[in-house]
Amino acid sequence: MSAPEKPRERSFPKIEFTDSEAGAKEFPSSKSRSYSYFTPAKLRATMYEDVTVDVQPDPDRHLTQGWIYGFGNGPGGYPKDWTTAKSSDWHAFRDPNEEWNQTIYRNNAAVVRQVELCLKNAKRARVYDGWNSTWLTFIERNVGAWMHAENGLALHVFTSIQRSGPTNMINTAVAVNAAHKMRFAQDLALFNLDLAEATEAFDGSAHRAVWQEAREWQATRKVVEELTAVGDWCQLLFATNIVFEQLVGSLFRTELIMQIAARNGDYITPTIVGTGEHDYDRDLNYTRNLFRLLTRDPEHGEANKALFTEWLGIWVPRCLDAALALQPIWSAPADKAVTFASSLDAAKAKFTALLEEIDLDIPEELNK
């Protein structure tokens, strides 16, 4: 009888430490569970910074192996040459509103509830029955036409560039901007539908022909369409939030609608338009911070100022033409509480103050 075979011993590969594993390198705070790889803007990192900073990869920060994906015949990732503006550190930008995924839904949901409650109360109180035909015509033509401008900016300006920036902080702010515009355009559409159902004197389809054919709106329509053709994401953001919104958007919303609606017995339209104004005020906060960062950049600041001055030379004349073309609208309401000249002067004054805040010279075209 043969002796039983001894069971073979299983062999395991020898463990070798290559110093590439997590925890291999010790440095200050390396044992802390709250260690951060970025320098927060304040003493402690906020929730906004925790969920946005360095979420989008960058070969200049931590991505030492370069882009790990990309198009076959194109650049990988998020190229910085998608804009002619330069920055020594794009990652220094922080959104003062601290917007991220959660706040988009929370803030927009609050506005939606406000608008729904406003429209529901208006229908229950039969508010629209007291509006005169002149004011109803003004709303159906002009507020309805502005809805197209907001929708165009939402879908073809901000949505198209909300993944073009070199950092997640910039792209998140632009994405929130797109959500604001989209929701505001939908609010105006809902308002239009409610009015069409509430009174036969209101033509709910008139806005389409006004936007496409009315002489006073064609210059505005032209600027919006020209904006959608711009490929440089930074120029698009500058031309829209700095120039167009100041000289055309705020002129129409703030200096006309918000000033004259109550005098014409309308307290509903200012409530809805006011939500769009609040959105733009928040969007202007991040825009101001971004362009102030670029004009004060220690390495590229002067070149950026020269570039932004060129952009002002392109877009200020176009937006002024659009603003001047809207002048007949100021004469349409029965109660004319403000003049076009005073409204335009107020818009120009705010635009001038904004340019001073981002260290840019006032363009000559503004005073012609």
From Swiss-Prot:
Function recorded in the entry: Component of the propane 2-monooxygenase multicomponent enzyme system which is involved in the degradation of propane via the O2-dependent hydroxylation of propane. Also involved in the degradation of acetone via the O2-dependent hydroxylation of acetone. Also able to catalyze the oxidation of phenol, methylethylketone (2-butanone), 1-propanol and 2-propanol.
Region feature Disordered, mapped onto this chain: 1-32
UniProt-listed Enzyme Commission number(s): 1.14.13.227
Listed Basic and acidic residues bias regions: 1-17
EC top class named in words: oxidoreductase
Induction, as annotated: By acetone. Transcriptionally activated by MimR.
Keywords, in A-Z order: Monooxygenase, NAD, Oxidoreductase
Name assigned to this protein: Propane 2-monooxygenase, hydroxylase component small subunit
GO molecular function: oxidoreductase activity, acting on paired donors, with incorporation or reduction of molecular oxygen, NAD(P)H as one donor, and incorporation of one atom of oxygen
Superkingdom: Bacteria
Pfam families: Phenol_Hydrox (PF02332)
Swiss-Prot/TrEMBL catalytic activity: propane + NADH + O2 + H(+) = propan-2-ol + NAD(+) + H2O; acetone + NADH + O2 + H(+) = hydroxyacetone + NAD(+) + H2O; butan-2-one + NADH + O2 + H(+) = 1-hydroxy-2-butanone + NAD(+) + H2O; phenol + NADH + O2 + H(+) = hydroquinone + NAD(+) + H2O
Protein family according to the UniProt entry: Belongs to the TmoE/XamoE family.
Lineage, broadest ranks: Bacteria, Bacillati, Actinomycetota, Actinomycetes, Mycobacteriales
InterPro entries (alphabetical): Ferritin-like_SF, MP_mOase_hydro, Phenol_Hydrox, RNR-like
Species for this entry: Mycolicibacterium smegmatis (strain ATCC 700084 / mc(2)155)
